[in-house]
Amino acid sequence: MMAAVDAILAGKYPAKAHARRVAESLQSYRNGCPGIVYLEAQKTRLIEDNDEPAPFRQRRPFFYLSGCPLPDSCLVYDLSEDQLTLFIPPVDPEDVIWSGLPMSTEEAQNQYDVDRVLVTTELNSTLASIVSSHGGKAIAFTIADQVSESTQFHGFSEVNHSVLKGVIEQSRVVKDEYEVALLRKANDISAKAHIAAIKASQTAVNEREIEGAFIATCIANGAREQSYHPIVACGENGATLHYGKNDDTLIDPVTNQKKRNVLIDAGGEYRTYCADITRVIPVGGKFTAETRQIYDIVLQMQTECIAMLKEGVQWEDVHAHAHRVAIRGLLKLGILRGAEDEIFEKRVSVAFFPHGLGHYLGMDTHDTGGNPNYADKDTMFRYLRVRGRLPAGSVITVEPGVYFCRFIIEPYIKSPESNKYIDTNVLDRYWRVGGVRIEDNVLVTKDGYDNLTTAPKAVDELERLAAS
């Protein structure tokens, strides 16, 4: 499988196809008028009060239409002529002393899927030439606050800052073969890193050691950046969805024994594309009885939800199904009590599963085009990052979870509307579980799905790796 992926990635990133996709969506805003798309790369900048460069992250709209990771660059796409021009910085002799020769225009032409490559000092003359060739009736589409003061749109009939960003973000929802290969590669590297993290738990005494094993494996395999700050949460820390400390001891101060589970939510970024994977590590090679019970519920939630995926499925329906499975499992354990339908309608399960089932994935971890409604008064759907039907070619995370967060659950216990559905005597046995989340990255296809994530999640395999 990965040999075929590497063969695809040996080719050029399909920037021209992406430009054409964006151009098609811009037609209704042009009214037959010629136009251009203008995008800038991220600028190099220094850390505040320092002469060191700040961490660089390429602007996603620019990368989507260029495949170019270089800072201080820009592009122009002539919509009428179907000509994509990349502009890269010229040689700065003083910078060569420190950093060596930069990429030449000839090298860039060979590497990127563009029609021509010029240097940035030629930008304004090129813009003037384009607008002149169209008789001064061209529209320039660009993104607000992402245009340098030195860029000149003299002669253009209109400069539209309002529509391009949204058009690109919607175009990014459906991935092509090359993008899927990038996401699969990011997942493959991240799976190796998760295995390394699981094995590291055997000797680790602090969360940071597990984080270090994950990051080191990503870098060694070609993913130099993380998709997001890793979450490495032992014990009750796992009840915090975006826990970020990653510096707690794995030794329980009461028992002086190792805490028995670590939630790790982490993914490497490969050539701008992200993986986003969550696993729970049975520290010492064995889940506690309570953690295993919750893990089985969450794995069932994920298994059934992934099986529902195909082109056109309503994501809200999949999310609601996850809650149904959670309710059944928690009823069986005795944490919840009462009728399933009543618990569902009263939204009591939100106390244990407060977030959305998943989000689009691509160049951003929480990728664009999901149309969330964070003002939704229905607490079950308020934090669902994707609303509506899933198109074939979209990649979505499926990440159900069950959590025992006192801050979230205690108001439900105190409320007369919901406390009758929660058995606190049974619940008290599960606080130390913290949280269980299982997350995979799944490609939606016409008739089903393709799970891009290969990191182990079966209980026997996790326990074997954690014991090795």
From Swiss-Prot:
Family: Belongs to the peptidase M24B family.
Keywords: Aminopeptidase, Hydrolase, Manganese, Metal-binding, Metalloprotease, Protease
SMART domains hit by this protein: AMP_N
Task performed by this protein: Catalyzes the removal of a penultimate prolyl residue from the N-termini of peptides.
CDD domains hit by this protein: Prolidase
InterPro entries with a match to the protein in the record: Aminopep_P_N, Creatin/AminoP/Spt16_N, Creatinase/aminopeptidase-like, Pept_M24, X-Pro_dipept-like
EC numbers, comma separated: 3.4.11.9
GO BP: proteolysis
Disulfide links within the chain: none
Bound cofactor: record note: Binds 2 manganese ions per subunit.
Keyword Aminoacyl-tRNA synthetase: no
Gene: pepP
Residues that, per the record, bind Mn(2+) 2: 265, 276, 439
Pfam families with a match to the protein in the record: AMP_N, Peptidase_M24
GO molecular function: manganese ion binding; metalloaminopeptidase activity; peptidase activity
Gene3D superfamilies to which the protein is assigned, alphabetical: Creatinase/methionine aminopeptidase superfamily (3.90.230.10), Creatinase/prolidase N-terminal domain (3.40.350.10)
EC supergroup of this enzyme: hydrolase
Organism: Aspergillus fumigatus (strain ATCC MYA-4609 / CBS 101355 / FGSC A1100 / Af293) (Neosartorya fumigata)
CC cofactor: Mn(2+)
Residues where Mn(2+) 1 binds: 276, 399, 439
Signal sequence interval, chain numbering: none
Taxonomic superkingdom: Eukaryota
Listed name of the protein: Probable Xaa-Pro aminopeptidase pepP
Record's catalysed reaction(s): Release of any N-terminal amino acid, including proline, that is linked to proline, even from a dipeptide or tripeptide
